[in-house]
Amino acid sequence: MQAIHTVQLLLKPSKYECQEIDRRFHALAHLHNVCVKHARKCMIRLQHDKQYSEALQLYHELSKKEKLSKKEKSQKSELSKKLEDRRIELGLSKAALERYLKVCGKRFSKLLSSQQVQTEADRVWSGVAKCLFENGKGLHFTKYMDFDTIGGKSNKNGARFDLDAMYVNWIGLSLKCYLPKSENSDAYV
């Protein structure tokens, strides 16, 4: 496994570069909130689905029992599979949210990479999973100011640092990096 290090370098972006970075964060916030809206709709459909609620009730009854017979164990696994299939049919899965945001993300393809959009869908899915399988209360919309980073699935994608030229390249945007002048500085590399 490779070690990952974080280096903080000083950026002095121009007015245009600041606006471009803001556009990217606004695009990410918009995509996140669109995905949350879609996931909420799917969760409401799931709550009102009679097949799902009946299967879920049976599943909970079996889960409360301490000792299960082989027949009950197989019935529980069948119910689990049935619940999962119904969630997938209604569009509540990690892959379904990624597919949904893929379509929405085409509009922002010059601002965000596809893997950055997929990562945002994964963040929304983790919230959905907490609501469905744990003690989560509900999904929340996120304000633009609450985003402090745009993540990706790997280091090969998104913002890339060019050590020779001292630039950060990020889908058509090049930002000049500056090293601190003295070795005593906290941010010295």
What are these regions (language model features)?
Residues 1-189:
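Nucleic-acid substrate recognition interfaces
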